[in-house]
A protein has these predicted regions:
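Fe-S-dependent hydro-lyases/dehydratases of central metabolism
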Residues: 1-421
Length: 421
């Protein structure tokens, strides 16, 4: 019987052919925790009486949400993870010395390998599907179970196939494609489904755009997002010291899909998700007509804090100034990205434009720190969620957009189309 890429990955891990709807127990290749979710997992690990990790090299702790710590509570949270990492001599432990947002850092370090089954105690773990892996978020207790046993149970998800056709116009990126998908199917349109992204338009999407695409699968309710390995993937992996030998899986012709969605990306304008749902997508042209003034612009996160995002922003900001009544915060996703941006002179452009450039952190995205919104404030953000109170006060508003729209809006002081600058 013909299989989807997701069914093939699970079949390889289980040792027999499995299909959508089956309950299975699978080996886990990589388990990922962070400074917020891992302490709960550690508590359960210790309560179980376990003395060692089932697969130490397949476990990573990435300190990213409140790093450097913002207060005593976050410092104590971080301390739990640090002490556990030191006690177990954890190889894949990343803190201030080699920091980054987990969903950008893990692929950068070669710790995400095509064909993997990956779980993380963070809902945007689905990002890693861009490398042809099955990756999904779970709770901290599930993470603890995998830490102890190296395994976990799954219901093999059915798949929605999303076929992107055409060549994207200038300033159309993976962020716009996934916002369009979510606009079409809604925030629960892919509930417990694998979103398989394919089509000739992917030839025009670099890995950074593909990570953005898979990152927001969860915003449609998806169990995972996945892109099969191609030459663009292989080029990205070429300089990585991969944790294991990659395994390339591809969906069979005639595999069973629950739904097939086709989108002509050549007709897309940049998409902006209005408050308070990622599905509330509108064309940037409509947003410009609405004349929406913004107090803050944030460029960063596991969705759009990669080097290409910073380059896009720099192209727009060069020789320009951030509007007087608007503040711009730029947060590179990893130290490596930050260093590359410095070497390319991007930081000079940002600072001269009037932006604040921070260390890598989730920070503002979750309303944690370093960019919290006040009463009634509006923000154009390259992040992935715009729920009520997501980035600050409950009366604040977040508009999700790509990095070009964000940078243009910072200059204009209101939502702007980068093609107009």
């Amino acid at each position: 019987m013909r299989q989807t890429i997701t069914e093939k990955i699970f079949s390889e891990h289980v040792g027999e052919a499995v299909f959508a709807g089956q309950i299975i127990e699978s080996a886990i290749d990589m388990v990922i925790g962070n400074d917020i979710t891992t302490p709960i997992s550690i508590k359960q690990f210790e309560l179980s009486g376990a003395k060692k990790l089932a697969n130490p090299d397949g476990f990573a702790i990435v300190m990213d949400h409140y790093i450097p710590t913002k207060d005593i509570l976050s410092a104590n949270q971080a301390k739990i993870s640090r002490e556990f990492a030191y006690k177990h001599d954890l190889k894949n432990y990343f803190d201030e010395k080699d920091m980054g947002i987990e969903h950008a850092l893990m692929p950068e370090k070669g710790l995400v390998v095509p064909g993997d089954v990956i779980i993380g105690a963070d809902s945007h773990t689905c990002t890693h599907g861009a490398l042809g892996a099955f990756a999904t978020g779970m709770g901290s207790t599930d993470l603890a179970f995998a830490m102890i046993t190296g395994r976990n149970w799954f219901k093999v998800p059915p798949t929605i196939k999303v076929i992107f056709h055409g060549k994207p116009a200038p300033h159309i990126y993976g962020k716009d494609l996934i916002l369009e998908v979510i606009r079409l199917i809604g925030v629960d349109g892919a509930r417990y489904k694998a979103l398989e992204f394919c089509g000739d338009a992917l030839e025009h999407l670099d890995m950074d755009s593909r990570f953005s695409l898979c990152n927001m699968a969860i915003e449609a309710g998806g169990k995972s997002g996945i892109v099969a390995v191609d030459e663009i993937t292989k080029e990205f992996l070429a300089d990585k010291n991969l944790r294991a030998e990659p395994k390339f899986h591809y969906s069979d012709e005639g595999a069973n899909y629950e739904q097939i969605l086709q989108i002509d990306v050549s007709k897309l304008d940049p998409v902006i998700a209005y408050p308070f749902l990622p599905s509330n997508g509108k064309s940037v042209r409509e947003a410009v007509r609405d004349d929406i003034a913004v107090d803050q612009v944030f460029i960063g996160s596991c969705t759009n804090g990669r080097l290409s995002d910073l380059r896009i922003a720099a192209q727009i900001l060069k020789g320009r100034k951030v509007a007087r009544k608007t503040r711009l915060i730029i947060t590179p996703a990893t130290q490596k990205i930050a260093l590359a941006a410095q070497k390319e002179g991007l930081w000079d452009i940002f600072v001269e434009a009037g932006a604040v450039v921070s260390n890598p952190t989730c920070g503002a995205c979750l309303g944690g720190y370093m960019g919290i919104l006040g009463v009634g404030e509006r923000c154009v953000s390259t992040t992935n969620r715009n729920f009520v109170g997501r980035m600050g006060d409950r009366t604040s508003e977040v508009y999700l957009a790509n990095s070009a729209v964000a940078a243009a809006s910072a200059v204009a002081g209101k939502i702007a189309d980068p093609r107009d600058l």
